[in-house]
Regions:
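Helix-to-loop junction immediately C-terminal to a conserved catalytic motif
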Residues: 3
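Hydrophobic/aromatic position at a conserved helix-loop-beta junction
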Residues: 6, 102, 107-110
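ABC ATPase NBD Q-loop/coupling interface
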Residues: 12-31
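ABC ATPase nucleotide-binding domain helical subdomain, centered on the C-loop/LSGGQ "ABC signature"
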Residues: 12-14, 48-89, 133-134, 142
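Catalytic Walker B motif of ABC-type/P-loop ATPase nucleotide-binding domains
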Residues: 115-118
């Protein structure tokens, strides 16, 4: 619904800005999102080519910064060809957690105002997940980050908690310490 790929059966889905302005979610609002799903979304090619899917003219410095934010730089820089290492479709040649971190780095590099992480840290251990979330808060202070998770530990980085139940979204906590 948030990406305008499906629409509610009744009512409407809107984005509400800090100033109260409402924008109805549609295919046109999709460009405001960087989306990282649970499964691998990497393509056959180099790591750099995968990152540049988000920002075609990304510099080495920008890619390095995004990889560091996603806790991927340490393993990418240790590969024989670094960001020029070839991977296969769906991140073949990498662990699932490594592929998730590269997908997160790609989303960071895109720089959209809303980052949607849909179980995007599910293959990470708790320590790495916590560091990725801390890094995102630091590196993207003006980006709205929407996190869907089944892991309670990730919730401590959220300023608002919502519960989806019976087709409704309900705010259950606001202004939690990050």
């Amino acid at each position: 619904v948030l990406l305008g790929l499906v629409y509610p059966e009744s009512g409407r889905a809107v984005l509400r800005g800090k100033n109260g302005c409402e924008i109805v979610i549609s295919a046109e609002t999709r460009c405001a999102f960087s989306y990282v799903p649970q499964g691998s979304t990497l393509f056959s090619g180099t790591i750099a080519e995968n990152l540049r899917m988000a920002k075609e003219n990304a510099t080495e410095e920008e890619m390095t910064a995004a990889l560091k934010t996603a806790c991927a730089w340490a393993f990418v820089s240790s590969l024989p060809n670094g960001v020029n290492t070839k991977i296969t479709e769906r991140g073949g040649g990498l662990s699932e957690g490594q592929a998730q971190r590269i997908a997160i780095a790609r989303a960071v590099l895109r720089g959209a105002p809303i980052l949607l992480l849909d179980e995007a840290t599910s293959a990470l251990d708790e320590k790495t997940e916590a560091q990725v979330l801390k890094n995102l808060l630091t590196a993207l202070p003006d980006t709205a980050c929407i996190l869907t998770t089944h892991r309670p530990g990730a919730l401590k980085y959220c300023t608002r908690l919502y519960k989806a139940e019976n087709g409704a979204l309900t705010c259950i906590e606001v202004n939690r310490p990050a």
